[in-house]
Amino acid sequence: MSKLSEKKIIELFQSKLGNASFVPEDVELFKIGKEQLVVKVDTFVESTDLPPRMKLDDAARKSIVSCVSDFAAKGVRPIFGIVSLTIPKKFSRSSIQSLARGFQIAAREFSLKILGGDTNEGKELVITFSLFGTTKKIVTRSGAKTNHVIITSGPFGYTGAGLSILLKNKKSSKKFGTKAKTAVLKHMIQYFSLLRPPDSFVEDDRCFQQTCLP
């Protein structure tokens, strides 16, 4: 990314797209009938997000977890997902199957249905995942009031620190380093059970084989 801050980059797009301001939340939303459609998109890039020890199925799962965690923060249940893949030519059939397995695991874990997506060839692995859901009201950043209780699924900062340790060889204490690296390699979150329906499904893992495998 350029030397411009993320905020400045967004402002440049705002000026060209005619939006006075994007929704200042972790998700995008717009009204459809009596409900709001909630959308989240996140991109996983091999050179900046994939530590040497991370397995490809964990990488695929992580790309979905990044979106699901923002849905959880807004009190929204994920329903559908779409994935776009840029796959290096060097990837073997086994590597691509590992990616498909990671998507399948996450879809079942978070009770969402992956509808399909797009595949391309490139120099490195890039996963862009879009998540969709509906709600009547989200938990906004501006909604916090005095005496409200804030609940998190774990401590903050371990994933970012772990990436710095694994990708940039940053130094840390052994205890902290172990926790940080584990946070990256496992990328586990505890999702609110009240947001999850009793059934768990993925459309059909054959769709990955048909679109991704030679």
Model regions and ranges:
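Helix-biased detector of long, well-ordered alpha-helical tracts
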Residues: 1-214
